[in-house]
């Protein structure tokens, strides 16, 4: 099971197996740096494979369309290219990758395993690589967007001096570069690189929690001041409202992705193994469901994006009618 392969890849493997992976490209259990997928017991997870495969097959097209709309409206409208929206577009691009690459390869993996009791190394590598890039970008960007909101609340008007769209765009590109690099370093089959990758995820998740707690304190203070009839500037109120919107998006991300991270931490640091491989499939699927849910939360909470999409959809429909 690739779920098991994904999250147990942090275990150390003997040098003999590592050196012969390339020569045995298509033998069960031998696929470069990925560990044995335990195909000999695939029948134990056949039902879960089918259910999670169907769930992801249904949600994948929606994730593609919804996140593509988010990326399109933000990238095509300068008025929407604020620092926070650029980071939201980065998150949407990550979710778009899930719909285009990760979920289809997951579905192929599950159905092939059920049909043949074996999945080729190419499919396993495609799924694993896409998964780790997506997961790393998501957690890193969550921290970045949380930091951006905290700076907006702390520095007020000076915020625009420190945080500019161009700088944020460069940061988003750097986030993608670093996570692609970390994923590529897995090919070294070195436990140190894998540990660094996992430690990075954990670090950014912890940073996100700390920052969101600080933001919550600021928002609570702001609401108390309103009750005491000490109104703040309209700019301040707008930043607080946007911080609440971003916090909602972050909360949804964490709820759906935390189970996967906990399983990974359990393997790496506690060396625990969950007997039912089905659990891995469900935690992965929960993370993928978030890629379809997140654009809905974004559209619901961010009025400017919701309005832009409402304007774009009729135009796209008219264009499609003209083509026909």
Locations of regions flagged by a protein language model:
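Membrane-lumen (extracellular) interface motif
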Residues: 115, 184-197, 267-278
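Seventh transmembrane helix
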Residues: 262-265, 281-324
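Extracellular TM2-ECL1-early TM3 structural module of rhodopsin-like
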Residues: 45-60, 84-144
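Extracellular-loop-to-transmembrane junctions of the mid-late helices
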Residues: 178-217
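Membrane-water interface of transmembrane alpha-helices
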Residues: 140-147, 210-226
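Class A GPCR helix-loop hinge within the 7TM core
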Residues: 135-171
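Extracellular N-terminal segment of 7TM GPCRs
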Residues: 1-65
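Intracellular effector-coupling site of seven-transmembrane GPCRs
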Residues: 217-262
